[in-house]
Amino acid sequence: MATNGENGRHQEVGHKSLLQSDALYQYILETSVYPREPEPMKELREITAKHPWNLMTTSADEGQFLSMLLKLINAKNTMEIGVFTGYSLLATAMALPDDGKILAMDINRENYEIGLPIIEKAGLAHKIVFREGPALPVLDQMIEDGKYHGSYDFIFVDADKDNYLNYHKRLIDLVKVGGLIGYDNTLWNGSVVAPPDAPLRKYVRYYRDFVLELNKALAADSRIEICQLPVGDGITLCRRIS
């Protein structure tokens, strides 16, 4: 997540790898990711690269990972909290069957509309229901309605880190038993292992404690199985088991 004060801090979109070697990361992208990247996703990635907050996007290797994951679990009904220009949303829409659905929520429709023409051109807009505004009130209403309990196959969260635990408290009721929740940025620029006096960017330092709190809570949650992966900026997969 970026703020105006962080504009221009990195001009290469999606460069969020935790690999120690930039050359190794480029090797992965150029050998296994970019050659297999669908044209609509490539187009959106290149457009997003021009956005001043481009580091907010899902990286290309993580998009590829999400696509494979969704197909492996035969996901059909999904949710995404935090959309930005829609790169991960597009990856999801392309991976779902034609009658698949995505409830997508973001506080900024303007960014979503950057990617919307590409989504429409790809013939995927019918899979997406976009809701502008904070996600928590929507989730609370869904839980109150009762009919959405256990109805989601996959939920991807890449939004305000200070609300991740609040999201989890609600999403655990909305994802089905055997379904997955994916929390993005759970290694948070590698800051989760940084010493207290490490020189961190202001926004990294601000959200660091929230990410640490989330990781600790997920590890202790007996309702889920977890797997934390160093893909992109770190993603934790939570499989609901009860």
Curated annotation (Swiss-Prot):
Alphabetized UniProt keyword annotations: Lignin biosynthesis, Magnesium, Metal-binding, Methyltransferase, S-adenosyl-L-methionine, Transferase
Residues holding substrate: K16, D158, N189
Note on how the cofactor is bound: Binds 1 Mg(2+) ion per subunit.
Database matches in Pfam families: Methyltransf_3
SUPFAM superfamilies (alphabetical): S-adenosyl-L-methionine-dependent methyltransferases
Chain sites annotated for binding a divalent metal cation: D158, D184, N185
UniProt entry tagged with the keyword Transferase: yes
Amino-acid positions noted as binding S-adenosyl-L-methionine in the UniProt annotation, renumbered to this chain: T58, E80, G82, V83, S88, D106, A135, D160
Pathway the protein takes part in: Aromatic compound metabolism; phenylpropanoid biosynthesis
Catalytic activity, reaction form: (E)-caffeoyl-CoA + S-adenosyl-L-methionine = (E)-feruloyl-CoA + S-adenosyl-L-homocysteine + H(+)
Cofactor dependence: Mg(2+)
EC number assigned by the record: 2.1.1.104
InterPro entries in alphabetical order: Cation-dep_OMT, SAM-dependent_MTases_sf, SAM_O-MeTrfase
Induction remarks: By wounding and viral infection.
Keyword Transferase: yes
One example of a Gene Ontology biological process annotation: methylation
Domain of life: Eukaryota
Molecular function terms from GO: caffeoyl-CoA O-methyltransferase activity; metal ion binding; S-adenosylmethionine-dependent methyltransferase activity
Enzyme class: transferase
Family: Belongs to the class I-like SAM-binding methyltransferase superfamily. Cation-dependent O-methyltransferase family. CCoAMT subfamily.
Functional description taken from the UniProt entry: Methylates caffeoyl-CoA to feruloyl-CoA and 5-hydroxyferuloyl-CoA to sinapoyl-CoA. Plays a role in the synthesis of feruloylated polysaccharides. Involved in the reinforcement of the plant cell wall. Also involved in the responding to wounding or pathogen challenge by the increased formation of cell wall-bound ferulic acid polymers. Methylates 5-hydroxyferulolyl-CoA more efficiently than caffeoyl-CoA.
Protein name as annotated: Caffeoyl-CoA O-methyltransferase 2
Species the sequence originates in: Nicotiana tabacum (Common tobacco)
